[in-house]
Every structure is written in C-alpha cells, then in structure tokens.
C-alpha cells in the first residue's frame, strides 16, 4: 500500500492492478472531481456525471449542465452505478481515460 499524497481513506481490499494508485505504479496529479457513477459496464472503467452551474449575464440567471468523465476503476475500489466517487487526474490510461477513482464516498441508490 503506497501513499498517494492525498488525504483519502485507503481501500480495504487489495488488488494486483498496475494502474491502481494505491497498489500499482500509477501516479496521480492535477485536478480532483466528485461525481455520481452513471455507467460501469466497461472493463475497469466507469462514466461519471457531474453537474456544473454557469451564470448567463444576458438573462441574469443560472443554468445547469452535466458533463461526463471516463475514469479508471481499480478492482480494490470497485465503484458501481449510483455511487458518489472522487476521481483525480493521472497520465492517460487509455484513449479516453485520464482520471482514476481514488475514493468511494456513498451510494445514492
């Protein structure tokens, strides 16, 4: 178990994944986001939806938008659809994955 440099609760399970920040060699750096898992069908991959609010000055109103992120899901964390997770930026793991799950906080379902 290695220290990733962030104050998060380490997973209880142990995995053999090379791309795990806790048990493998993947280093994390950059932005940290929190969102809800909307899809977990891919192999060690999840899709995260985040709500972003923006101000439109012309109408003096706020708008809600959702953005999606594709992140690597290590077997030791194993987040499922409906979980609230914290992801952090890392080197590109694949063509679309540049984030990795570092903590699973709660389940909304």
Swiss-Prot record:
Protein task: One of the primary rRNA binding proteins, it binds specifically to the 5'-end of 16S ribosomal RNA.
GO cellular component: cytosolic small ribosomal subunit
Family per record: Belongs to the universal ribosomal protein uS17 family.
Keyword rRNA-binding: yes
Organism field: Methanococcus vannielii
Gene: rps17
Keywords of the record: Ribonucleoprotein, Ribosomal protein, RNA-binding, rRNA-binding
Protein name: Small ribosomal subunit protein uS17
Molecular function as annotated in GO: rRNA binding; structural constituent of ribosome
InterPro entries reported for this sequence: NA-bd_OB-fold, Ribosomal_uS17, Ribosomal_uS17_arc/euk, Ribosomal_uS17_archaeal, Ribosomal_uS17_CS
GO biological processes: translation
Self-association state and partner proteins as the record states: Part of the 30S ribosomal subunit.
